[in-house]
UniProtKB/Swiss-Prot annotation:
CDD domains per record: MATH
Keywords: Coiled coil
InterPro entries: MATH-CC_domain_protein, MATH/TRAF_dom, TRAF-like
Gene3D superfamilies for this protein: Apoptosis, Tumor Necrosis Factor Receptor Associated Protein 2, Chain A
Segments forming domain MATH: 8-131
Provenance organism: Arabidopsis thaliana (Mouse-ear cress)
Name assigned to this protein: MATH domain and coiled-coil domain-containing protein At3g58440
Length: 358
């Protein structure tokens, strides 16, 4: 593979049972541009225990001594609410001495562990890293910067440095619309209007006064509806369980979601029918396979019986007939002599005379 080939990749890391994990966690290793990478997270912060920290780590032995890579990368914390992912990213250089870069203050732990914020789902956190390695590898002595030169505060920080320099936060679709007290991104405005038109009493008993909480609940509702609109093939049983949890949360918050509960019950029934149908289909396929094997076995036995029947039907040749007749006569003669001897000398003499000897 050419060293000048630009390579990029996306890696997803799912942290199961987040609440029981140790403070420092490493992801499995993944490879980009011939180098081995992994993600490193500090659940209680690398330096500040109020924040969740995430870093991208390059295996030191992946690059020859005196060389370094220029990399553009981003790290995303998935959120169940649309357009609310936490994304930080930017360019930096990796070498043998500075092989870990990332974000000390990635996200407030208080916000991360709050279920209403949408980052933790069933005690599971999903982190996505996008790594873009630029084409050239440059010798370190050609790109060394003056140590006295200040660093741009909009660059990512190396984990070995004393200060934390945060990359720019990537935000998509910043335009928002206020619909009946719910502020949503413009791309979701039409969906919210349709929900409120068809179910005008959905938020009559909603007790949330905080604007951020109101927005989070509406985004939660939109995300739930989008999930339920997937095909049965895409929907897993785990998705349906999570939908149940989401409905309970919305109902407890004061949303009237009876109509959505009915839809979810219908989905569950259809999913059960699908699973039962797939089970029956699998059973029929297994039975059919056994019948096919039995058919092949019977076909083989049939051919064997046909061959044996043809052999049995074959007529005797003249030589076969003579040999068999002579053998039969000799057998009869020997039997008569043996019988005569056992009956006594007189009968034996008679049989001997009848044999032509006088």
């Amino acid at each position: 593979m050419s060293l000048d080939l630009k390579m990029q990749d996306k890696f997803t890391w799912v942290l199961e049972k987040f609440s029981s994990l140790k403070d420092q966690c490493y992801s499995p290793v993944f490879t980009v541009a011939g180098c081995n990478w992994r993600l490193l997270s500090f659940l209680k912060g690398a330096k500040n225990d109020r924040y969740f920290s995430v870093y991208l780590d390059l295996e030191p032995g992946s690059l020859p001594p005196g060389w370094r890579r220029e990399v553009k990368f981003s790290i995303t914390l998935d959120n169940v609410c649309p357009n609310t992912d936490r994304v930080l990213g930017g360019p930096c250089f990796f070498d043998a001495k500075s092989n870990i870069w990332g974000f000390q203050d990635f996200l407030l732990l208080e916000k991360l562990v709050n279920i209403a914020e949408g980052f933790l789902v069933n005690d599971r956190l999903t982190i996505v890293a996008e790594v873009d390695v630029l084409p050239s590898i440059t010798r370190l002595h050609l790109v060394l910067e003056d140590a006295s030169r200040g660093r741009d505060p909009n660059t990512v920080a190396c984990v070995t440095e004393t200060c934390d320099y945060v990359l720019m936060e990537i935000q998509s679709d910043k335009e928002t619309v206020d619909i009946n007290g719910f502020v949503v991104v413009s791309s979701k405005a039409e969906s919210v209007r349709r929900i409120l038109e068809r179910h005008p009493d959905i938020s009559v008993e909603f007790r949330g006064k905080n604007q951020q909480l109101r927005n989070a609940c509406m985004n939660f509702l939109l995300s739930l509806i989008e999930t339920m609109c997937q095909s049965l093939e895409e929907l897993s049983n785990e998705d349906l369980v999570e939908a149940d949890v989401a409905l309970t949360y919305l109902r407890d918050a004061g949303f009237k979601v009876d109509w959505l509960e009915k839809k979810l019950d219908q989905l569950k029934e259809k999913k059960e029918e699908e699973m039962s149908g797939l089970a029956r289909l699998h059973e029929i396929e297994e039975r059919l396979q056994k019948l096919k094997l039995l058919f092949v076995d019977l076909e083989s036995q049939l051919q064997k019986e046909k061959v044996e029947a043809l052999v049995a039907r074959a007529p005797l040749s003249f030589n076969d007939g003579v040999c068999r007749f002579s053998g039969f006569c000799g057998f009869v003669g020997e039997s008569l002599f043996s019988y005569a001897w056992k009956q006594g000398p007189s009968l034996y003499s008679l049989s001997f005379m009848s044999n032509g000897t006088e």
